[in-house]
From Swiss-Prot:
Assembly behavior: Interacts with POLR2A. Interacts with SMYD3; the interaction may bridge SMYD3 and RNA polymerase II. Interacts with SMYD2.
Name of the protein this chain belongs to: Probable helicase with zinc finger domain
GO molecular function: ATP binding; helicase activity; hydrolase activity; zinc ion binding
Lineage: Eukaryota, Metazoa, Chordata, Craniata, Vertebrata
Superkingdom in the source lineage: Eukaryota
Biased composition annotated in UniProt, kind: Low complexity: 1388-1431, 1941-1956
Zinc finger motifs (C3H1-type), residue ranges: 178-206
Pfam family, one: zf-CCCH
Annotated source species: Mus musculus
Record flagged with keyword Ribosomal protein: no
Family to which this protein belongs: Belongs to the DNA2/NAM7 helicase family.
Positions bearing Phosphothreonine: T1163
Amino acid sequence: MEDRRAERSCEQACASLQRQDYDMALQHCTDALLSLGQYSMADFTGPCPVEVERIKIESLLYRIASFLQLKNYGQADEDCRHVLGEGLAKGERAFRAVLCCMQLKGKLQLVSSILAKSLSGESLNGMVTKDLTRLKTLLTETETATSNVLSGCHVEDLDEGSCNGWHFRPPPRGITSSEEYTLCKRFLEQGICRYGAQCTSAHSQEELAEWQKRYASRLIKLKQQSENKQLSGSYMETLIEKWMSSLSPEKVLSECIEGVQVEHSPDLSVTVNTKKSHQTWTFALTCKPARMLYRVALLYDAHRPHFSIIAISAGDSTTQVSQEVPENCQEWIGGKMAQNGLDHYVYKVGIAFNTEIFGTFRQTIVFDFGLEPVLMQRVMIDAASTEDLEYLMHAKRQLVTTAKRWDSSSKTIVDFEPNETTDLEKSLLIRYQIPLSADQLFTQSVLDKSLTKTNYQARLHDLLYIEEIAQYKEVSRFNLKVQLQILASFMLTGVSGGAKYAQNGQLFGRFKLTETLSEDTLAGRLVMTRVNAVYLLPVPKEKLVQSQGTKEKVYEATIEEKTKDYVFLRISRECCEELSLRPDCDIQVELQFQLNRLPLCEMHYALDRIKDNAVLFPDISMTPTIPWSPNRQWDEQLDPRLNAKQKEAVLAITTPLSIQLPPVLIIGPYGTGKTFTLAQAAKHILQQQETRILICTHSNSAADLYIKDYLHPYVEAGNPQARPLRVYFRNRWVKTVHPVVHQYCLISSTQSTFQMPQKEDILKHRVVVVTLSTSQYLCQLDLEPGFFTHVLLDEAAQAMECETIMPLALATKNTRIVLAGDHMQLSPFVYSEFARERNLHVSLLDRLYEHYPAEFPCRILLCENYRSHEAIINYTSELFYEGKLMASGKQPAHKDFYPLTFFTARGEDVQEKNSTAFYNNAEVFEVVERVEELRRKWPVAWGKLDDGSIGVVTPYADQVFRIRAELRKKRLSDVNVERVLNVQGKQFRVLFLSTVRTRHTCKHKQTPIKKKEQLLEDSTEDLDYGFLSNYKLLNTAITRAQSLVAVVGDPVALCSIGRCRKFWERFIALCHENHSLHGITFEQIKAQLEALELKKTYVLNPLAPEFIPRALRLQHSGNSSRQQQSPPKVKSLYHPQSDHFQSDGIVQPNPSVLIGNPIRAYTPPPPLGPHPNLGKSPSPVQRIDPHTGTSILYVPAVYGGNVVMSVPLPVPWTGYQGRFAVDPRIITHQAAMAYNMNLLHTHGRGSPIPYGLGHHPPVSLGQPQSQHAEKDQQEQNRNGKTDTNNPGPEINKIRTPEKKPTEPKQVDLESNPQNRSPESRPGVVYSNTKFPRKDHLNPRHINNLPLPAPHAQYAIPSRHFHPLPQLPRPPFPASQPHTLLNQQQNNLPEQPNQMAPQPNQVAPQPNQMTPQPNQVAPQPNQVVQQQSQAPPQAPQPAPQLSPAFQAGPTNAFFNNAVAHRPQSPAAEAVGPEQPPPPGLPDGHSPLRAITQPGPILASPLNNFVDESSPGLPIEEALDGVHGSVALETLRQQQARLQQWSEHHAYLSQGGIPYSHHHHPHLPHLPHTPIGLHQPPVRAEWKVAGRADDETETTFSRFQDLLRELSHRDQGDTGELAEMPPPQSRLLQYRQVQPRSPPAVPSPPSSTDHSSQFANFNDSSRDIEVANSPAFPQRLPPQLFGSPFSLPSEHLAPPPLKYLAPEGAWNFANLQQNHLIGPGFPYGLPPLPPRPPQNPFIHIQNHQHAAGQEPFHPLSSRTVSASSLPSLEEYEPRGPGRPLYQRRISSSSAQPCVEEASAPQDSLAQGKESQGHSNPPAFNFPAPESWANTTSSAPYQNIPCNGSSRTSQPRELIAPPKTVKPPEDQLKPESGEVSSSFNYSMLQHLGQFPPLMPNKQIAESANCSSQQSPAGSKPAMSYASALRAPPKPRPPPEQAKKGSDPLSLLQELSLGSSPGSNGFYSYFK
C-alpha cells in the first residue's frame, strides 16, 4: 500500500501543479517523498527500486516547480542539486529514462516551462541560476530526444513499444539501405556536432551499429508481413513488383491489348487552373470476343488519396448493368458477370479525382482480364494556375556570353582616368599577385588537415589565391550586351538618395539588370559585391572590317552605384570624346566585368600584419576566472534592461585588463540583444581610465547603429569622452549616410567625400567605429599594437577569419578581444569548393566556439529572444541552440494560423536547361494564394501591412523570379521575395519558405548520404539542396519571422532527403500537433516514408510519365531528342555523330560553373524522335545521374517529386556511383569526382539508343562487366535497392538525369522485332560509342581502332543501332539450341517437347514474364527459360490474384507462351523463380547443363529462398530477396548474353555447341562440357542481385575473360535486343544504356543440374568454377561436391550493413566469387587471346597487354586498376589543369588483396584481412572489405545500394585469398526472387556475352588480377577528368590504408564533391 500511496501522492501533485495550486502540489510531493523514505533499497517487500527512483525524481521535480512558483528559490535550488546528484549518481541513463517516461506522459513540459520562465524572468543569483540552468538543459535535451523519437518513430519503434530496447537516437528517415547510415566525422573528431540530436549521421560506432540493426529488424518485419500477405497479398503491389522486375515489362502491363478497344473521355492528361478541383474520366472497354474483367485497380500509391473508382458497368453496347462499387474504391474485383454468349462485351469504368492542393498528380489504372499483359491506362492532372511564361520566354535583354577575357594582348585597354587608387592599394595589388605556378599554391599547408599556429599564414594565403581564381572564373562567365543609356546626372531616392552630376567631361551610363545578374544568382551576387569596374566595347551597327593587326579598343568605366534594378557607370572623358557620347542617347555595348581584387589583397595584408597569432589560438588548458562580486553584478550604472546573461557578458568584457582572458565570445541568435550588450559594455569601459575602444562591424548599417542608437544619445546626455570617430570608405557618397552619423565622421571641406583619418584624429577619440574593411586604414597609421585596449567585433560570424583578423593586427595578448555573433547563421560565401572544404569560409567566431569547451566562461550564450513568437523560438531553440533559447518578447499570433504552419504542394522541381537553380510551380501558386489569403486576414495586432510585413524566402533564384512575377501579376509587389542569402539582418512579420526540392531531383544524388559532403558543413550539397541540407540556411530563414513561419513544400521529400530531414520531421510533427499541417495528414506522410524506406516499389510510381514542364512541352513534341541538357560545350567524342545518342545532347557545363554553383541537375533529354507519349506520361525513365553516373529509374511525380530508382545502368561508369557512397575501387579519379564526374561521360546523356543497344558492349562483354556488376552490386547494396530488374534502383537513383542517356521511351519489344532478336543487331549490341567514356577505356572511338571484322557473334562496337530485320526464329522448337540454352540457364523446360513441365514447375506462359510475386522466386534460370522459351501453357490461376497473377510455382507467371524471341532473361528472372521441373534430367541433358545453374547459377533468389541460409541472418535473407531479384535478372541477362555467345565453339567445349547469337532462338547450348558449376566463375561477378553491378560491369577487365564471357553474354544480347514496351520507359532506358555485363553471369554452361534447383545458390557458381578446368584447384574442395558446402567460414553472414538489398549475393552458402569482380583471386594465368576476339576486346587488348584485364571504367575492379599497369597511357590529359593537379589519387581504390585474404568467417575479419593478405594478388579491395559492418573501415567498400552487405570478393574461387563471394553478400532479399540463377538474366543485365568458358574466365581473371597488382598510376588533367572516363589507378594496398572509418571517410571526402574546383584531386 505504501508504494501505491507514494505514487498516488505524486499523481495528485502533478494534478495540483496543472491547476496552479502550488501549495497543494508541494504538500503532495512531500507526502510522496516521506512515503518513499520508509523503504530502504534492500527492502524486497517494497516497490522495485526502479519504481521508487522514478517516483522520487518525479516528486522532486514537481517540488522544484512549486517552489519556483512560490518564489522560494533557495529550497528550489536545494532540491535541484538533490535531483541532479541523485540522478547522476544512479547513472545518467536511468535518470534520463525517468525523464523520458515523464515526457511521454506529458508531465515534463509542465516542469520545463516553469523552469524556463523562472530563469528568464527572475534575477536569480549565480549559483541558483547555474543549477537550474543545468536542470533545464537536461529537461530540454530529454524533450528533444523524446520528441525526435516520437516524430521519427519508425515502424520498428512502434512495433516494439516506444523506444524499447534501443539505446540511441532513432535513425534518419528516407534511408533505403542500412549502408546509407554514416558516422559523423565532426562529432568523432571534435566531440561536438552542430546538428546535435538532429544529425543524420551516427555519433558513435555503437549508434551506427544500432541503426543498422534497426534497419535490419524492419526488413525482417517487412518480410514477415509480406509472407503473411502472400496469400492475400496486395494485387497492386504484386503487379508493380512484377512489372518492375520484369525485363519485358510490356508483357506484364501494356497500354493496349489484343481484342480490347479502349475509349476514354476527357483527355488522359488534364490541366486545371484551380486548386480545389474535381475531375472524372470514363473508360469504355469493348472486348471482341467477349472476355471477363476480373479486376480494376489503381496502382500508384503516392497520390492514391486523390483518386478513386466510382462506377463500373458491364453489358453489350446497348444495355449496361451497374456493378457494385464500394466508396473510395481503389481496387474492384469482378468476375461475376454472365456474358451469355455475346460476341462482344462492353465495360464502362468511371475514375474520379479530387484535390485541394496544387501539384501534379498521376495515376495508373489497370484492367485485368485474367491474362497478361494487363491493360493499363495512365491519367495525369496538373493543378496549377495559368502560367504566363512571357517573362521567361521573352528574349533576354542581356545576351550573356562566355567569352575570352579582354586583356592587353587581345584588346587595347583605355584605363579610366583619373585613377583614384591610392599608392597603398596599388602596392597591395602588385604585392599579392596570384602565383603563376599553381605548384606554389598547393603547398603542404593547404594539405594539412586543419589550421594550426604554424601553418596559419601560409595556408590562408594559398586558400585566398584559390578562392580568387574561383571568383575570377565565376565573373568571367559573363559578357553582357546591353543598351547603355548615357546620362549627365541621375537621382537616387530613399535614405541614401540624392542627385549626382557628371563633371570634367565625364558622363554616366545606366543599364538594367536582369535575372542573370541579380543578387539572386551566384555570379550576380559576385558582380554586385566584388566588381567595381567594367570594360566597355561599343558594338557597331554594321560590322566594320578590321584591318589585320589592329586591336579593338575597350574602355574602362567604374561602377558608380548599384540598385536593385540598375547599375550606373561613370564613363571617362577620353571614352566620351572618342565615341562621341552625348547625354540622353543610347549606345549598344558589350560589357565585361572586372573583379575587384582589393578586398582579397587586403586579407592577405591582414594575414601578414599579424605578428603573433597566439591570440587566435588561445590556450584553453587553464580555465580563466572572471571575477564576480555583488557590486559588479548589481552595479547601478548597468542598464536595468540587461538580463542575467547579458550582465554576465558585460562583466566578462569589463573584467580588469590585469586579468588576461582569451577572446570572449558573445553568442546569440538574432534578437537576443548582442549589439545592445556590446554598447552597454562600451559605456562601462569608458568609465575606466586609460581605455580605448575599437568597435568593428561587418556592415556599415550595423556600425551606424552603434552611433545612432547608443553612442549619440550617450554623448548628448553629457558624456563627451564617449564621442566616437566613425571611419568611412573614402569613396562612399556622403549623401548616402545618415545625418546623425555625419557629425562623427571626417568629411572634406567640399562636403563631398569622406577623408582618411590621420594618427592625431585617432588619438583624439577614445571610441573608433569602423567596418572590417575600413579597419585597414588604421593599420596603416603606425598605431602600435595594444593602442586599443578593447576590440569589440560585432557580426563576427558573417565574416571569414581572414577578414576578422584585420583589426586584430592592432591587438596584443593583453588586449580584451570580444567577438559577438550567431554561429548558427549563414557563413560567408566562398566560391571555391576546394577552399570551402578547407574551411576558408569559417569565421573566427565559429572556429573559437568549437575550440572552447562547453562550459568555458568566455563562451557566453545570450538566450532571451525578444523578436519572435514563442513557438518559433522554441523550435529554433530545441533544434539549433541546445534548448537554451527562451522567448521574452510578446509577439501576437494569427487566430487561424499557428506560428509554425505547413502547406503541402506536391509539385515537381524543375531545372532550366542552362540554370543551376530549380523552380517548382506548384509551390509558386501555393505561396501566392496563401499570401493573398493572409493579406485578407491580416490581424490588427500585427500593425500596418507594409513592405517589411511579408517575406518570401527560397534558396533558388529561379523560384524567386517566378514567385515575384506571379505576385506582380496579382499587384502584390510590396511582398519581399528574396533568396535566403540576402535576408540576413532583415525581419518580417510573416515569412513564407518555399523549399522547392522534391525527391525527384535530389534523391539520386544523395545516396549513401554523400560520404564527403555529409561531413562538410557548407558543401555543394548544401548549396544545391537548400533547406534540405543546410541547417544554417534553415535557421537563418526561420529566425527572420516574428509571428508566423509558413512553409510550402513536399513533406515527404523534406523528411527523407538531406541533412536537415530530422529538423523538418520535427517541424511537421509540431504542425501536426497544432493542427497547422495543411494538404496532407501526418499519417499519410509516415505511411509514405515507411513505404519509401522499406522499398515498396509502388511508392515510386513505376508507370509515372516523365514530367515535362508545360513550357517545354511544345518544344518536346518536335524532335526533342536533340535537346541539350546542358549548355553545349563540346561534342562528345564518344558519340558517333550518327549515333542515337545525340552527341550534342550532352554537354559539359563549363567547369567554372561548378565552382560555387549548385551542381545542375539537368532534366534528362527527352527520348529520340517525336514523343508519342508526350501527352500521356511516359513510364519511369531510366536516367543517368549527372553527378554519379548511376542509372536512375526516374519515376516522375512520385508523391510530388519524381522518384528516382536506380536501375541497372547499361553503361558502366566507374567513378560515378561512387560519388556518394564511395567504393574505393570505384572512385578512381578524384579529380573527376571533384568536378562532377557526370561531366565525364557525355555518352549517356544523348538521345537514348534503342533498347538493348547498349547492353553489353562487346568490349565489356567480359568480366569487367562483371566487375561493374559487382561494383554496382555493391553500390546497389549500398543504396539498398533491391529490385531485380532494376537491380540498382538506388544506383540509378544516384544517377542524375544528366547522366543518363536520354531515355527513349520503351518500345514494345514485340512491336519492334528488330530490336528483339539477338541476331537482329549483331553488330550493334553495344555500340561502343554509345557508352563512351565509361565503357571505353579509351576515349577514342572504337571505330578508329583497327578491329577485326566482327564475328557474327559479336556485336560490332561501333555500329549504330539499326534495327535489323528479325531473323526468323521458330517459336520454340525443341531443337532450338538457343532456347535450350536459355532454358538450361533458367532451369526451366523450354520447350514442351523437351520436357514436360513438372507439375510444380511454372510453365512459362507466353506473355507472362515475371514470376509471381508470391512464388518463392523461381530459379532465375527457370524463369528465363520460361519466359523465353517456355511453351505456352494454360495459366493456372493463383487463388489470390486475378488470373493474371498466379501464385506459387504455378505457371501463372508465364501464362502466355513467350513468343518468338528470347525473353530477356533479366526481366523474367525477376519473378520468383520456380523450381526446376522435376523432370529435368539431372546431369545429362544439355538442357540440364545449362539450365541448372546448378550451384553455379544458383539464382540469388533461389538460393536465398532455398537455402535462405545457414549462413544468413534473416535480415540478410531479406536482403537476399531483393538481391536475388537482381541476381535473377543478371542471370537472365547472362542467358541473353549467351545467346550471343561469341566463340561458341570455344565455349561449348563440352560438346555443347553454342549457337550463334544470330539465332536467338537457338539457345547457346550450355557450356556444359565445362563441368564447372557456373557460378564459381563469377568469383567476382556480381550476382544478379547486384543489378547495379551488372550494369557497371560493362567493360571486361580481362580480355580473355571477356572473350570467354562474351560468348555467354552474347546470348544475353539476344534478349537484350528486345525492346520494352513504351510504357516501360525506364526499362528501356535501362536497356538503352550500355549495360555492364551481368555481374554474375556465370557461364551457364556447366551448370550441373543434378538436383532440381537445389543448387541454385552461388555455390553452384563456385562449384562450377571449381570444376572448371580453369580453376581447378582454386575452389575449396567442399565446393565440388555440394553446392552449398562451403567452409564454415564462408557461411558467416556478412555484416548486415553490407547486405546489399538488391545486389546481394543470394547464395547463402556460397561464397561469392568475384571472378570478374574486383579481382580474381585465383592465381590463374591469363588465357591466351583468342583470335576471334570481339572487336571490343581487341580494342582492349590493343590497350592492354594480353594478360591485363581491360580497364572498365566503372567496374569496381577496374577501379582497382591493379591490372592496369599502363593506365597512364589511357589517361587523356586535357588542357586546363596544371600538372600538379593531374596526378589522380589512388587512394580511392584499394587493394583487394587484403580483402581477398580475409577469411570469410566474418566480415569483421574481412576488415582485418584487408590488412593482411596476399598483396601481390590483387589490388582491388574486396567488396566485402568495405562491407564489413564491424570493420573499422566501413567506408571502404560500401555497396552503393545501401544494401547491407557488400559482395564478397572472390573468396570462393580463390580460397587462398579468402575473399568472400558476393553471394554472401547478396542481400537475402534477393532470395525472394531468385531461386535459381539465370545466366540470361545476368547477361542481360550485365550485358556481356560469355566469351570464354567459365574456367577460362576464372583463369584469366585471376591472372590478370595478379598480373598487375601495381598498375601504374594514371595522371589526369583537370580537363581530362572532366571529359574522360576516370581511369582507376592501381589502388594502393589496403593494408596501408587506415582502416578505421574515419580515415576512410576522410579519404573519400577528398574527392567527391560535385562542384569542386578540382584542386583536390591533386592533393589526394
